[in-house]
Amino acid sequence: IIISNLISFPKINEIYELMGLLSQNNYSNYPPIHQTITFLTLLITDKSIITSIISLRLILILFDLGILYYGIKLLKILKKPKNIIFIYFLNPLVILELIGNLHLEGVMVFFMVLSFYHLYRKKEIYSGIFLGLSILTKLIPLIILPLFLCRLGLKKSIRFILTITVLISTGFVPFIKFKSLINYSESINLWFS
């Protein structure tokens, strides 16, 4: 476990033992922004798991506030009632999984909302940047990439894809070590086995 060499939690070995074989025997398949947020949360706390959990929960709440702010702005552009945004926030899955269980899909959704916001403002470069950041948080937004391309047309799609490609390539620079890329790829391949 790489983090155990950098950060010393008193019960890190006990936690590692409780992870289960799938997590113990494979490297993380989370993209760089996800890794960075969780790593920084561990780094800034006082080596207390409780403090780390509270810190991560506060970070996720800040991203949720960003979803609220830009979600309302996006709904205004779309000429939809702004109270629709509360369908997202009152969804039990969002409440339990994102804030309760500390999943970083809320960070991904924040960047996706910003991407859509800029898409509807006809700023495809900014839209590409934020979709790239969303992909660097979780890989799920790759699924909706074709929807953007249909809306943008060929010329703007090329700029959009180039923006995302440069951003994602830059985001993976810390993984340039060939062995790290192999470990990441092997973990991603678990999804398809």
Task: Map each language-model feature to its residues.
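Primarily membrane-embedded glycan-assembly and transfer machineries that use lipid-linked glycans
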Residues: 1-101, 107-113, 152-193
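Membrane-interface alpha helices of multi-pass inner-membrane proteins
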Residues: 95-98, 114-118, 124-149
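Residue-level recognition of short, well-ordered coil/turn positions
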Residues: 123-124, 154
